[in-house]
UniProtKB/Swiss-Prot annotation:
Superkingdom of this protein's organism: Bacteria
Binding residues annotated for substrate, in chain numbering: 140-144, 173, 186, 190, 279
GO molecular function: iron ion binding; N(6)-L-threonylcarbamoyladenine synthase activity
Matching SUPFAM superfamilies: Actin-like ATPase domain
Pfam families tied to this protein: TsaD
Protein name as it appears in the record: tRNA N6-adenosine threonylcarbamoyltransferase
Gene name linked to the record: tsaD
Length: 347
């Protein structure tokens, strides 16, 4: 880069749920800063995220996160190329804080504003591991979503399978609560699963159905019924075995559906993304399944970027910007935002 050439720097915002995050990303794949202010302790006593509490924390943290992100990256507003923000899906109040902050910065400093689908951000976290090669497939597993997303080319998405009820991450939190685990329960359940055995034969709903959709409500109900029955008769169940049996059922369904999707949609990469992508059991199973696949390479989002963060938003924003995806100051939060087949510019 010549001394007069301006760097491509995106200031990215993420506030869709219970993490306030601001990052500075260079060229879509280099993290100069990624500030994350978590709210987990504030929500633990409620057993889950309380939208009003989340919004209040975002208001308190957003300005500090901006200042810290710029300071850590050692850049100023004049150095920025654009501003990016998650505008959905998520909690409407939480989203509005990030959207408002991003629009304010963009307007005040005359910078382009890039709207980002939160779920696309999760997928593009893989860009910090290696470039995404197309066609690609993403198994997107989080607290609110469980989806198989086919990507024939850059900036194109097609959901070919999704949960019909509970998301996998939501099921983890619910069974964790039954076992007395604080929110979020995923890591503890995963740790216990590695210490136990698959002794409870929980159902694997839709595993053999002729589609790529998922269902975890039946598994959750079977788990709750098993523990409730044990309580009624005074039986103590091994929590590690319960966790192992539950996790095995979840992983079996996710892996089976993914393998069948890959058979119908040949791709160069399978990207594992979302909060549940940090699950050791799932990462190990997919790695084993794809070890013998000569054409599809598994790319796992970095553990530190599996949860909500602005770095992943900046990664996809860079791609969206190259495709002319821009918004103006009329951009609003869209809590029910879905994937478009093509990520068209927001008007």
């Amino acid at each position: 880069m010549s001394p007069t050439e301006k760097r491509n720097l995106i200031l990215a915002f993420e506030s869709s749920c219970d993490e306030t995050s601001v990052a500075v990303i260079e060229d879509g794949h280099r993290i100069l800063s990624n500030i994350v202010a978590t709210q987990i302790k504030s929500h633990q006593r409620f057993g889950g995220v309380v939208p009003e509490v989340a919004s209040r924390h975002h208001i308190e943290e957003i300005t500090l996160c901006i200042e810290d992100a710029l300071a850590e990256a050692q850049v100023g507003y004049d150095d920025l190329t654009a501003v990016a923000v998650t505008y959905g899906p998520g909690l409407v109040g939480a989203l509005l804080i990030g959207v408002t902050a991003a629009k304010t910065v963009a307007f005040a400093h005359n910078l382009p504003l890039i709207p980002v689908n939160h779920m696309a951000g999760h997928i593009y976290a893989a860009r910090y591991v290696e470039p995404i090669e197309f066609p690609a497939m993403a198994l997107l597993v989080s607290g609110g979503h469980t989806e198989l997303v086919y990507m024939p080319a850059e900036n194109q998405f097609e959901i070919i399978g999704e949960t019909r009820d509970d998301a996998a991450g939501e099921a983890y939190d619910k069974v964790g609560r039954v076992m007395g685990v604080n929110y979020p329960a995923g890591k503890t359940v995963d740790d216990w699963a590695h210490q136990g055995h698959d002794t409870f034969k929980f159902p694997r709903a839709m595993e053999k159905d002729d589609n790529f959709d998922f269902s975890f409500s039946g598994l959750k109900s079977a788990f709750i019924n098993t523990t409730h029955h044990a309580d009624q008769i005074g039986e103590t169940l091994n929590k590690q075995d319960l966790a192992a049996s539950f996790q095995q059922a979840v992983v079996d369904v996710l892996a089976e559906k993914t393998q069948r999707a890959l058979a119908d949609y040949p791709v160069k990469q399978l990207i594992l993304a979302g909060g549940v992508a940090a699950n050791r059991g799932l990462r190990e199973r997919l790695a084993a399944d794809l070890a013998s696949n000569p054409t599809t390479h598994l790319v796992k989002a970095p553990l530190k970027l599996c949860g909500d963060n602005a770095a992943m938003i900046g990664a996809f924003a860079y791609v969206a910007y190259q495709h002319g995806v821009l918004a103006d100051t009329s951009l609003n939060a869209d809590p029910s935002l879905e994937f478009d087949w093509v990520a068209d510019p927001v008007k």
